[in-house]
Structure formats: C-alpha cells, structure tokens
Amino acid sequence: MKSNIDIVVLKDEYPGDRLRYFLRSVCKFIKFVNNIYIIVKNHEEIPNWLNTRDNIILLTYDDLYRSCGEEISKNIIEQYIPTIQGLTERFIYFSDSVIISEPCEIEQFFNNNKCCIFSTTKFINPKKYNYDENIMYHNSKYINRLCGIKMHKYEYEYINRGIIPLYKSPYKLLGITNNDEFDIRLYALYLQKHGYSNFNTILIKKLVIDE
C-alpha cells in the first residue's frame, strides 16, 4: 500500500550497477513508497537499462541547481533536494550503495512523527586516530550526552550517510549553505537536538547493507 513518503536516491558517479540492485531491493522490500526520485549528474549518467515508470522520476544536477558551467559536488545538490517539485513532506534519502535486505515498515523510518536516525558505531585507537576522527568523536560525545546515550571511552557513533529519513519543511528552514561533506549529517543532528528525531527505533536492528 502506497503512502505519502517518497524516496530520493543520489546516483554515484562510479561505474557499475549499484543503482539497479538498490531499485530492485526497494521494489521488493519497501512496499509503501510513493515516488522514487533518481538524481544523476547529467543525461550521460542515466543507465541504459533504466525504464522509468509512473513513480520513477529522473532529475539531473541542473534540474536542481543552475551551475552556470562550474563543477559542483553532490554535497551542494543535497542542499537542494527539498526544492524537488512534488516531493512529499516526509521522504527518505538514500545513497545507491545501500541494499535493503528485509521487509520494511514506515515506523522503522518515521516513529511518532519523528525521523529515525541510522547510526554506525566505530572504535578508535587513541594513539592513531586522525583529525577527522577526533572531530567526529567529540561531536558524537556531545550529541550522545544530549540524548542520554552512554558510550565507550574510545568509540563514537556517526550518522550513516547511506539512509536518512527527513522532513522537507525544517530542512528548507535550516537553509544549509556550507559545501561540506557532513552537511546532511549535521542537518539530522540539528533535528535531533530540536526534538524532531528519534534514535531508538533502528539503532540495533540491521536493515541495510551499506558498502
């Protein structure tokens, strides 16, 4: 049964059929999906095997952002996802590196009007961890302290970029403009701090295989 929840997937520029397997897994295991928006860099990136149906809509970077010829990254494109015409208020953002491995229900993505956060736990070597890990470790400590989550001294949780349930209105309201690889993750943390998100539903159960 379809719902008022769309899926947005950003196709990676790497060659291969990851998008094909992602779509197959969605059609098999996420029965409630309304429309699927596939964002590709340009028309040359559209796979020749892809047959668009009524609920599969193709978009290019230029459809979302007029670049005037300059090179743009997918991090910028992510900021313009809420401008997609017809996109539902609740939607799920996917990377095409994800494969859904079992049947999913709406409540596993949106619970009590809150979007659930998929996180991954990583342990670090305190003698070898690098600058980025240092930032993520201390950010994770702060967020987990806000949420009442206890963590091991040398571990941190970071948001899995492969799958992020989102609300369109607060995303647009936040107005992220920074071209940074953590932008969309910071948006999810912003929602968590302001009471939109829920850490509890999917933290333990493994639904996806993320490369």
Segment roles from a protein language model:
Residues 33-43:
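Short beta-strand/loop segment that forms part of the nucleotide-sugar
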